């Protein structure tokens, strides 16, 4: 856990030096596992490199998530298809309800006819 805290504090120092307005601070554990941090530290023997890699993972993941959400929102025809499927389901429900109402009226009519 101390390695994570050290890497995170180094990451914060790097952020203070190179502050980017688009970045938002979130825990590094959301993006990198503990094993990955340890392996990186053992490979490079530098907490600064671990922090820089963590920073890059954080920034690239943030940018990627933004691009994906923007692409999904801006995909042509998505809203039209969604509205069409909602309309189709509501029409099916209306027809189903109408069919049930017609069936209940027919049964009532037959019951009244049988009583007479």
Curated annotation (Swiss-Prot):
InterPro entries: DUF3654
Family: Belongs to the UPF0329 family.
Protein name: UPF0329 protein ECU05_1650
Organism encoding this protein: Encephalitozoon cuniculi (strain GB-M1)
Lineage, uppermost ranks: Eukaryota, Fungi, Fungi incertae sedis, Microsporidia, Unikaryonidae
């Amino acid at each position: 856990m101390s390695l994570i805290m050290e890497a995170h504090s180094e990451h914060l120092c790097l952020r203070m030096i190179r502050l980017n307005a688009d970045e938002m601070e979130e825990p590094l554990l959301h993006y990198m596992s503990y094993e990955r941090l340890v392996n990186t530290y053992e490979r490079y023997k530098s907490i600064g490199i671990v922090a820089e890699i963590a920073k890059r993972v954080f920034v690239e993941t943030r940018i990627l998530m933004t691009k994906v959400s923007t692409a999904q929102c801006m995909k042509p025809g998505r809203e039209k298809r969604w509205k069409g499927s909602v309309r189709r389901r509501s029409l099916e429900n209306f027809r189903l309800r109408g069919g049930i109402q017609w069936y209940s009226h027919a049964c009532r009519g037959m019951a009244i006819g049988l009583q007479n």
